[in-house]
Regions:
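Predominantly a Rossmann-like dinucleotide-binding segment in NAD(P)-dependent oxidoreductases
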Residues: 1-58, 175
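NAD(P)-dinucleotide binding in Rossmann-like oxidoreductases
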Residues: 56-62, 72-137, 154
């Protein structure tokens, strides 16, 4: 997660509250994407953090977190929340596979495949993102909870994602790998 808006940490509400986690405020979106695509459950998380970019600022917390996550099916995921980077705000996403690799960057989706001669062929798909009104999305979720429509599904997914984010926080605080149940 390339945040690229360091001024929001230094001058906005994120730097003024008693605790702000770039993991809970940013990395959580990547965990959501991974879980949505793979449906994987995580069994181990080890995270590292630093405060280099915001070292001499009012912002008191980490500006970069990198987590290595192992799933129950032994897939490995790496999530980086880089809030101090010089990069447009964007959720970069790469899936490496044995038959193809998918890379989602700002302006396109790239598929890397090998042909019969073992040469890599790159297919590029241009993307146009729709902007989503977060207020509408939040109201939809709240209405589902209040009506108990898909309540269990929303709850379990949401709580599992939060559980994984809290394991990242614990790994940083203890400087240890966290084993999940």
């Amino acid at each position: 997660y390339n945040y690229g808006r360091i001024h929001k940490l230094n001058n906005g509400w994120r730097g003024k509250i008693p605790f702000y986690s770039i993991n809970l405020g940013g990395g959580i979106h990547l965990i959501d994407i991974i879980r949505w695509i793979t449906r994987e459950k995580f069994k181990k998380i080890k995270s590292y953090s630093n405060k280099i970019v915001t070292k001499n600022t009012k912002y008191k917390f980490y500006d970069c977190i990198c987590s290595i996550i192992k799933s129950n099916n032994n897939k490995i995921f790496k999530i980086t929340s880089n809030f101090g980077c010089v990069y447009p705000h964007f959720h970069k996403f790469i899936v490496y596979g044995t038959k193809m690799t998918l890379e989602k960057n700002q302006d396109c989706l790239k598929l890397y495949k090998k042909n019969a001669f073992n040469k890599i062929k790159i297919s590029k798909i241009n993307l146009k993102y729709k902007t989503i009104d977060k207020g509408v999305m939040i109201n939809k979720i709240l209405n589902n909870i209040l009506k108990k429509s898909n309540y269990l599904e929303i709850n379990n997914d949401t709580f599992n994602t939060i559980k994984y984010c809290m394991a990242i926080e614990k790994s940083i605080a203890t400087n240890k790998e966290v084993i999940l149940k």
